[in-house]
Structure formats: structure tokens, C-alpha cells
Amino acid sequence: MTEYKLVVVGAGGVGKSALTIQLIQNHFVDEYDPTIEDSYRKQVVIDGETCLLDILDTAGQEEYSAMRDQYMRTGEGFLCVFAINNTKSFEDIHHYREQIKRVKDSEDVPMVLVGNKCDLPSRSVDTKQAQDLARSYGIPFIETSAKTRQRVEDAFYTLVREIRQYRLRKLSKEEETTQCIKL
């Protein structure tokens, strides 16, 4: 069974835990209890492949930022979450992305931009703004609602597909560099 190490990042209060718990346990957590760090595992079938998702739900609070480097090193793919009713959380995405690229020492890191809380009647981040940002990064963008479960699986499964493509790219690069000619 293939294992995927997913990390959920974003500012405090954007719904990282709510998204993760909705995926894992199929229910919405209404109360806000800031996370320090929680780990979840779930077996799912994505595109016919049985996968083990190892999901790290991280702290959005700035006082835990020192822990970020460690989980960014071990994560294979990142859900970069902002809340559509919180402009600052959207602006923070850039900092998370830059930190991930720095820690991974790579421009090519599997990521999905997630605009959460799309069930809310008012928004401060326009869908087009988020689509444009995702396009500039070359990553998918998905709007979710942890409350209604809208596109929650889609966000995590899309990240798994991004990791698969990344692994294939890495594999073909390794094959290119290790080819030898027998005389």
C-alpha cells in the first residue's frame, strides 16, 4: 500500500482541523480549539489505488512557527489553506509557500491551494484572486466547506494526485541520469 505524507498548513482559524476531521471522521467540529500538532491516518482508494494517508494537522498560531521547519521537511505534499472570509489568511499563503520551498530546497513541491468556508454568505477573497494566485504558482485551487463537506475529499485527493505526478517526474529524471550504454 502506498503511503502519502500530507501536511495541512495555513493561518490560525482557517479550518485546517475542521477539514482534516471532516475527511477522517465525517463530522464537522464547530468549536475552535487551536491545534499544536495532530496526526491522522486513513486508508482510502484514489483512482483505483489503495493509499494510506498520513495527515499532519499543524498549528496556525505564530507562537508555534518554530515547529514548522520540522514538519515541512517530512511532508511530501501541502494543503495551503486560507479562509475565504479572511484576507490576511490569504495573504499569509505566500509566506507558507516560501517557507516550504526554502525548507524543501526546491521550487517543485506538491501543493494545493484551498479556500475554505465557502458555505459562508460573505467573502473577502474573490474566487478569481485565488485562481490567479494558484495559476501563478502552477498548483490546483479548490474551494471547500468543512461544515458542509463540500469538496473536502477532492482537496486531499487532488494533493495525492499531485504527489503521484511529482514522484513520476522524479523517477523519470533519475532514469535519465542513470542510463548507461553497454558496449
From Swiss-Prot:
Keywords: Cell membrane, GTP-binding, Hydrolase, Lipoprotein, Membrane, Nucleotide-binding, Prenylation
Record motif Effector region, residues: 32-40
Keyword Cell membrane listed: yes
Pfam families: Ras
Name of the top EC class for this enzyme: hydrolase
UniProt note on regulation of activity: Alternates between an inactive form bound to GDP and an active form bound to GTP. Activated by a guanine nucleotide-exchange factor (GEF) and inactivated by a GTPase-activating protein (GAP).
GO molecular function: G protein activity; GTP binding
Membrane topology: Lipid-anchor
One GO CC term on file: plasma membrane
InterPro entries found in the cross-reference section: P-loop_NTPase, Small_GTP-bd, Small_GTPase, Small_GTPase_Ras-type
Binding of GTP, residues: 10-17, 57-61, 116-119
Catalytic activity: GTP + H2O = GDP + phosphate + H(+)
SMART domains for the chain: RAB (SM00175), RAS (SM00173), RHO (SM00174)
The protein's Enzyme Commission number: 3.6.5.2
Gene Ontology biological process terms in this record: signal transduction
Compartments (UniProt record): Cell membrane
Protein family per UniProt: Belongs to the small GTPase superfamily. Ras family.
Task performed by this protein: Ras proteins bind GDP/GTP and possess intrinsic GTPase activity.
UniProt name for this protein: Ras-like protein
